[in-house]
């Protein structure tokens, strides 16, 4: 089984760097397309300040020159979901589960094990980058499918922008998760709740060595419990009373 999680915009490079490997051909093609942009073009491409665009330009050129520092992806990304994932002081069993089952979906690196080396970069599937005339989603679709086609169980903690990179056949196999708060009988869902809960849920999967949908249903984490009345066979809903 594989658990798929998205990348994040926020990154923390205050970490020990690690050795890297050569970029796969699909990644190199994306990098080559990005490297054609000047700092001022990146400003409008990323919709960021000139200062931020200059920083991103340096990151891209460092990757291109193979001088970029690399870090374990799960620790490099530092968005809200990531900050709620157990990333340190894992037992041997938890570490093995993480290495075998948790994969990050990236618009630059593809579908890779969570502790794979990644360099700081900014790219997601909403960005209108063309790679050899194709959209990012079209460019990656075959490789994304290939990464999970043998799996019987695929847990998706992805947003739709990442899920829709996969073919319909693969998406039909995915088990998805929704996290809601019950405020006096009113069910609420918003991105902050979802991001925190996804991190806490992944931590519960790791700590409990979950391998099946049935085991996932039995989890109780960060105040969230499974709600059968709101769920579908492949769409599990967890609710926290506040």
From Swiss-Prot:
Ranges in a coiled coil: none
Protein's recorded name: UPF0246 protein SPN23F15130
Phylogenetic classification of the source organism: Bacteria, Bacillati, Bacillota, Bacilli, Lactobacillales
Protein family: Belongs to the UPF0246 family.
GO cellular component, one term: cytosol
InterPro entries for the chain: YaaA
UniProt-listed Pfam families: H2O2_YaaD (PF03883)
Any GO BP: response to hydroperoxide
């Amino acid at each position: 089984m594989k658990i798929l999680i998205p990348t994040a915009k926020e990154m923390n490079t205050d970490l020990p760097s690690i050795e890297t490997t050569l970029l796969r051909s699909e990644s190199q093609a994306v990098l080559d397309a990005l490297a054609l942009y000047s700092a001022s073009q990146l400003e409008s491409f990323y919709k960021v300040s000139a200062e931020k665009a200059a920083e991103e330009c340096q990151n891209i050129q460092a990757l291109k020159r193979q001088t970029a520092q690399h870090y374990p992806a799960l620790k490099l990304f530092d968005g809200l979901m990531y900050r709620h994932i157990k990333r340190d002081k894992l037992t041997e069993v938890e570490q093995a589960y993480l290495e075998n089952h948790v994969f990050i979906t990236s618009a630059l690196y593809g579908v890779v094990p969570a502790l794979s080396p990644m360099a700081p970069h900014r790219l997601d599937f909403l960005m209108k980058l063309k790679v050899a005339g194709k959209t990012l989603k079209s460019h990656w679709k075959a490789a994304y499918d290939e990464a999970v086609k043998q799996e019987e169980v695929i847990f998706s903690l992805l947003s739709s922008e990442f899920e829709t990179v996969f073919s319909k056949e693969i998406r039909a196999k995915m088990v998805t998760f929704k996290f809601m708060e019950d405020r006096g009988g009113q069910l609420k869902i918003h991105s902050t709740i979802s991001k925190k809960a996804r991190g806490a849920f992944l931590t519960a999967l790791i700590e409990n060595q979950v391998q099946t949908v049935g085991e996932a249903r039995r989890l109780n984490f960060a105040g969230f419990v499974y709600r059968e009345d709101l769920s579908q066979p492949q769409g599990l809903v967890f609710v926290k009373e506040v």
